[in-house]
Amino acid sequence: MIIRRLFSISNRSFFLKKPQFDVKKIIEMIPQYQTSIQNRELIEADSIIRSLQLLGERYQNIKEIDKVIADIQIQRKSIEAQIKKDKTKITEYSAALKALKEQYNDQNSKSSELKKKILETCKSLPNTLDPTVPLDAPQIEQWINPLKTHKTSEAQAHVDIMLKKNMLDLQTASNVTGMSWYYLLNDGARLEQALVAYALKKANENGFSSCVPPSITKKELIDACGFNPRDMNNERQIYALQDTNLGLVATAEIPLAGLGANKVLELNSGECSKKLVGVSRCYRAEAGARGKDTKGLYRVHEFTKVELFCWSKPETSAKVLEEIKQFQISVVEELGIPAKVLNMPSNDLGNPAFKKYDIEAWMPGRGKFGEISSASNCTDFQSRRLNTKYRDDNTGKLEYVHTLNGTAMAIPRVIVALVENFYDPSTGKISVPECLREFMNGQRYI
């Protein structure tokens, strides 16, 4: 199959049910949604807001049409009752029945069109925003393994170090595949494997069940997860399989979320969430990427990532987000990487996220901080589109779960951080963090 950046879909086969939105609640929260749209600086903000402002009117029109349809049905049943009593009247009432049928079809068509527009509006909306989300600049929540100063050092650039140590081959990868692909070799490959093993072991010890998900999913699942990454030039960021409805996943979050699609999950009274950890290859087109970050491991088209995914009861999702964040902090602490935890601003949040934390590591060879993990609470944004529910213990009713995701280990960027922070120019050696040594046969240096 040919891989393209635009979906060309034939013979669609949908497995997801039509999303069910609480339209009345959305209408009540129009100011909050409008603020979310504006603060996220969405490319189509004006169009989405115009559609949102028509939502109340369209919803009221449907209620009025429903009354008209109900009245038509009453008239039809009355005539049919009279015909049932006296079948000789069928000719007398045939014109009236025909007129009522035409009125019914006309009103039903209007109602269907309005419902379609309402559904399109609801699907286009981003999540609302947690009140603690900053407006346009990240807030530093915490420092991890803090340094007194952050000095740039070209001698610690990961590309030069890894090429010299035969850990990385970019030229051959460029010939074989293209720019921003790479080979990890020898200790480079072993370092990736150690990071994966460490992250999986730590996640399992923290109650996450293991999963190896597919790296290709249906486009409808990608859309339902709200994952439509693009740069500010609106260039597409998803790889698709030509003439199919399939795409390569940009994160294991997508297939892990799909594991709960069209299901009622068992969340017992003493269980606030179900937790998964999955490892997969991830694919990013990175259209529009520029600069030196495209020449190393920081911004690549394909990479390995260990992902955390949780389904939570609504009342506990804020707590679960904090637990994911603390897990990520402990990983970075044990690796010894200097970093900062950020409460990310609204203009950095994807449509599904209600709140998001990032962890950025100091990378002296790059001369700046770089994101190595993120954690998001998506509340019911994804579950409504994926039809993932649980049964409320108190009411017995089916309710939508909240979904959360977080990076356990984004391999290439963590390798960048490790190499650039732990390379000693005086000895020419890279120190291996103690937590990884058991997965590298006790190796202390590269």
UniProtKB/Swiss-Prot annotation:
Pfam families for this protein: tRNA-synt_2b
Compartments (UniProt record): Mitochondrion matrix
Keyword Nucleotide-binding among UniProt keywords: yes
Gene Ontology molecular-function annotations: ATP binding; serine-tRNA ligase activity; tRNA binding
Database matches in InterPro entries: aa-tRNA-synt_IIb, aa-tRNA-synth_II, aa-tRNA-synth_II/BPL/LPL, Ser-tRNA-ligase_type_1, SerRS_core, tRNA-bd_arm
Predominant place of localization: mitochondrion
Keywords: Aminoacyl-tRNA synthetase, ATP-binding, Ligase, Mitochondrion, Nucleotide-binding, Protein biosynthesis
GO cellular component: cytoplasm; cytosol; mitochondrial matrix; mitochondrion
Residue numbers binding ATP: 284-286, 300, 371-374
Domain of life according to the entry: Eukaryota
Catalytic activity, as annotated: tRNA(Ser) + L-serine + ATP = L-seryl-tRNA(Ser) + AMP + diphosphate + H(+)
Documented EC number(s): 6.1.1.11
Subunit structure: Homodimer. The tRNA molecule binds across the dimer.
Domain notes per entry: Consists of two distinct domains, a catalytic core and a N-terminal extension that is involved in tRNA binding.
Family per record: Belongs to the class-II aminoacyl-tRNA synthetase family. Type-1 seryl-tRNA synthetase subfamily.
Physiological role: Catalyzes the attachment of serine to tRNA(Ser).
Miscellaneous field: Present with 405 molecules/cell in log phase SD medium.
Name by which UniProt lists this protein: Serine--tRNA ligase, mitochondrial
Source organism (scientific name): Saccharomyces cerevisiae (strain ATCC 204508 / S288c) (Baker's yeast)
Gene: DIA4
